[in-house]
């Protein structure tokens, strides 16, 4: 009989069990680590593709990266961007019309609108209480309240409060990235004869998103565009249409580019563009007709015409002048020209609330938004003129002019104004308009970030809506970007 083995202690038996199971334990641990890592990658990929409008840091986080907090002191633009020195130029003589000039016309003269001081964030009571603007890199000093939500964390909060969706903000980013890809080597956009307008449009799109020359992703594109605009604007003596004389389309191009230059100065306080801005705005002020309108070529008098100007041209001049007013530079003639423009808009308003091309008997539905927006931009009042215009706009849209990108009566030019006008008025008009336009414009975007040709177009716009190349794709893309930036680009304000 074999001798019995000595009884093993508890510790010995435990050691044997652990030794036998060590390979199983190691294998299980490795598999658990792998599953954790794979799951983390999937979740990261999912959330990285979505703009984060609720970042706890107070800054908007989008898929182009986190917007860093600005330095407390003003950024040194001399070292970080390379604009040419401001040219020593003299603005054209500002023969701004006066109320007396207007009163000689057979129309009732409206009381001159009081000068609207550019409000700052702390002084405004119409900005939502929980929108606290930040200042990303390149933005200097407090912005006027109406522009305060285009930067930092305020952008995301304004998006949510005003009914924006992450899909529309993602479309804006795709559009801006497309603009970067198609920018000309010299910094401009568009071909010969269109570069002034298209570069101005593109700058407005970038600035509307809070981008400056020192922005992480879009800064280089903005910088190159400003170099091109300032160099060529100086070359053509402040004519931002980039021609020696103002032709028919030149008054549009000039005003659009001046509009962008005014916004740029307001956001950065870059003093090197002041002289060029003064000269450019001088042409607009000096080119206003006696009745407060603007005409092709800035012609002040046209024999046989009741008015030398038209509402379509006036719309861009008014936007450029309001942007100039917001700079705080107090350029002579600007406020008076805006007062006079309000007199003209009252003159051309139609009995149904719409606005005429040259007068109240020349009603154009596409100009209704022009009249409403431009009136509100300067008067900052929801008066009878504005509300009658909004009623006309909404009734016409719902009954005859639906917001359909590929519809028979599609009109991006009108929608650009209508979108802003409805936001400024707010209420049911904005709720209905936002429902009609936001998804339609977002879904119409092409995969590359541009907006494709449309099936039809109003005669006044023509090929810009329907052509596949040329300036048309730039025109469509910029207007759509600006529409989708409406939630934060300009906020309704009061005096």
Which residues are covered by each model-predicted region?
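An alpha-helical repeat/solenoid feature that recognizes helix-turn-helix modules
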Residues: 133-174, 188-221, 234-282, 286-340, ...
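Short hydrophobic "helix-edge" motifs at membrane interfaces and signal-peptide entry regions
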Residues: 20-22, 176, 281
């Amino acid at each position: 009989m074999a001798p019995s083995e000595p009884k093993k202690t508890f510790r010995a038996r435990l050691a044997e069990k652990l030794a036998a199971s060590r390979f199983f334990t190691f294998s299980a641990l490795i598999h658990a680590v792998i599953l954790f890592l794979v799951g983390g990658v999937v979740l990261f990929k999912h959330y990285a593709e979505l703009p984060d409008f609720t970042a706890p840091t107070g800054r908007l986080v989008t898929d182009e990266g986190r917007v860093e907090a600005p330095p407390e002191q003003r950024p040194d633009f001399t070292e970080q961007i390379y604009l040419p020195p401001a040219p020593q130029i003299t603005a054209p003589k500002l023969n701004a019309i006066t109320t007396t000039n207007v009163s000689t016309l057979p129309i009732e003269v409206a009381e001159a609108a009081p000068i609207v001081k550019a409000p700052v964030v702390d002084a405004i009571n119409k900005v939502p209480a929980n929108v606290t603007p930040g200042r990303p890199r390149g933005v200097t000093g407090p912005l006027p309240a109406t522009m305060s939500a285009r930067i930092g964390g305020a952008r995301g909060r304004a998006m949510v409060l005003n009914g924006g969706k992450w899909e529309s903000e993602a479309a804006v980013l795709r559009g801006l990235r497309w603009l970067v890809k198609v920018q000309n080597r010299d910094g401009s956009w568009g071909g010969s004869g269109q570069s002034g307008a298209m570069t101005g449009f593109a700058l407005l799109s970038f600035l509307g998103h809070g981008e400056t020359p020192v922005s992480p992703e879009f800064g280089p594109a903005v910088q190159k565009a400003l170099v091109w605009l300032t160099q060529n604007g100086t070359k053509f003596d402040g004519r931002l249409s980039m021609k020696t004389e103002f032709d028919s389309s030149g008054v549009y191009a000039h005003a659009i580019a001046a509009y962008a230059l005014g916004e740029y100065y307001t956001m950065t306080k870059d003093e090197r563009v002041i002289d060029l801005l003064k000269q450019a705005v001088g042409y607009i002020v000096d080119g206003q007709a006696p009745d407060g309108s603007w005409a092709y070529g800035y012609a002040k008098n046209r024999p046989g015409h009741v008015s030398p100007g038209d509402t379509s041209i006036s719309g861009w001049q008014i936007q450029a002048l309001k942007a100039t007013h917001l700079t705080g530079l107090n350029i002579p003639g600007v406020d008076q020209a805006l007062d006079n423009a309000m007199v003209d808009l009252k003159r051309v308003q139609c009995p149904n609330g719409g606005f005429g091309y040259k007068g109240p008997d020349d009603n154009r539905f596409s100009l209704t938004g022009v009249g409403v927006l431009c009136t509100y931009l300067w008067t900052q009042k929801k008066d009878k003129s504005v509300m009658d215009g909004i009623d006309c706009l909404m009734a016409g849209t719902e009954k005859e002019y639906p917001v359909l990108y590929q519809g028979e009566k599609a009109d991006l030019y009108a929608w650009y104004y209508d979108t802003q006008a409805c936001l400024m008025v707010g209420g049911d008009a904005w709720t209905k308009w936002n429902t009609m336009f936001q998804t339609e414009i977002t879904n119409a975007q092409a995969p590359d970030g541009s907006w494709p040709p449309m099936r039809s177009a109003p005669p006044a716009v023509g090929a810009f809506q329907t052509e596949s190349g040329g300036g048309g794709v730039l025109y469509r893309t910029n207007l759509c970007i600006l529409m989708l930036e409406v939630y934060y680009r300009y906020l309704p304000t009061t005096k």
